[in-house]
Curated annotation (Swiss-Prot):
GO terms classed as biological process: translation
InterPro entries in alphabetical order: Ribosomal_bL33 (IPR001705), Ribosomal_bL33_CS (IPR018264), Ribosomal_bL33_sf (IPR038584), Ribosomal_zn-bd (IPR011332)
Keyword Plastid set for record: yes
Gene it is expressed from: rpl33
Physiological role: Component of the chloroplast ribosome (chloro-ribosome), a dedicated translation machinery responsible for the synthesis of chloroplast genome-encoded proteins, including proteins of the transcription and translation machinery and components of the photosynthetic apparatus.
Protein name: Large ribosomal subunit protein bL33c
Amino acid sequence: MAKGKDVRVKVILECTGCVRKSVNKGSRGVSRYITQKNRHNTPSRLELRKFCPYCYKHTIHGEIKK
């Protein structure tokens, strides 16, 4: 049986707070996490609350394109 595209794909989550601050040069860097998601169960963009070491708090990390 032929396998199609993989169901589980790696996604990169980026801090939305740091992205806004980096435009104004108020941040030292951008926090990124690498995780996996199941495309069949979660077809939309993934957003999780993760700890950002640059903001020093839990912020929303959104999925970005590779």
